[in-house]
Amino acid sequence: MIAQGEVVIENLDVRQARDGKHHSALIRAATDINVNDGVLDIQLKAIAGKPILNAIVVRKKHVVANNWQLVWGDEFEQDGAPDTSKWNYDLWPAKKVNGEDQTYTSRAKNVRVENGKLILEAHKEQHAGAEYTSARLNSRGKGDFLYGRAEIRAKIPAGQGTWSAIWMLPSDPYKYSTSCAENEDWQGSETCDAWPNSGEIDIMEHVGFDMQNIHGTVHNKAYYWQNWQQRKSSIEGKNIDQQFHRYAVEWSPETITIFFDDSPYFFYSNEATGWKAWPFDHPYHVILNLAIGGMWGRAGGPIDDSIFPVKMEIDYVRVYEKQHKNNIEKI
């Protein structure tokens, strides 16, 4: 894709879906295009296949509002283990969710604060019945919020088989569940519909076989990947494994917008049709994890064991609310 005489997207190839078997629709965003004469010139060339272009949307450059007030976060200033007043460990076996190949641990080898950064580090090793180890943290019950802005500055790893994620789940996953009790282990359960019913917001997902692309997504009962009605978008991110970038979401009762370095590329609106399309009306919490393999991580081929160890680095996590509101909730 060429805009104003410059290549802004080199490849618009439709990638495989998470199951690695099917193709999905494609929404891509290009940023930092300067128009000086009031006319935007765009050129598209089909290299292979017969693509269908449904729409082109042009938006003004986003300027982050100055009325956000910091209400929760972690700057990772103290070396050692993560602050357990802010974070919980998810200690899970391999294959619990998404077919992921790693086991999540709380060992310093896999998760630690070091030189002002949170480190999530994956290793190729046999441990607890798995062939790989890594880490996953969540802020449930310690940093839950309803509406606002969450911003995370991070550097994510390269390598075939990596699956990095910065995302959010409901702090009450059973709010819209119809098939399971509150004491049931709902994540990874095939009989509990807490997911997708109660929602999910993916601020950033990245898989190593699709190195240049960052993905933002929401999941709910009406729109999620298993019913082929996914709501997602992607943006090209250069040097994402070499430099830190900002990943953010702004969430209100009407809209969800996801950003890469303050460039908005995913937009989702409340259709006012009920909880199936908008379960995003109750507190959520932040999740940080580095998965290995799984349905999406393996979609581009086998895990490359030569890449290990690999690490995801987080500089900070910050949650803001509008100054005239009081929507932060501690559960």
Regions found by a protein language model. Give the residues of each.
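Compositionally biased, intrinsically disordered or flexible polar/acidic segments
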Residues: 1-64
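GH16 jelly-roll
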Residues: 63-331
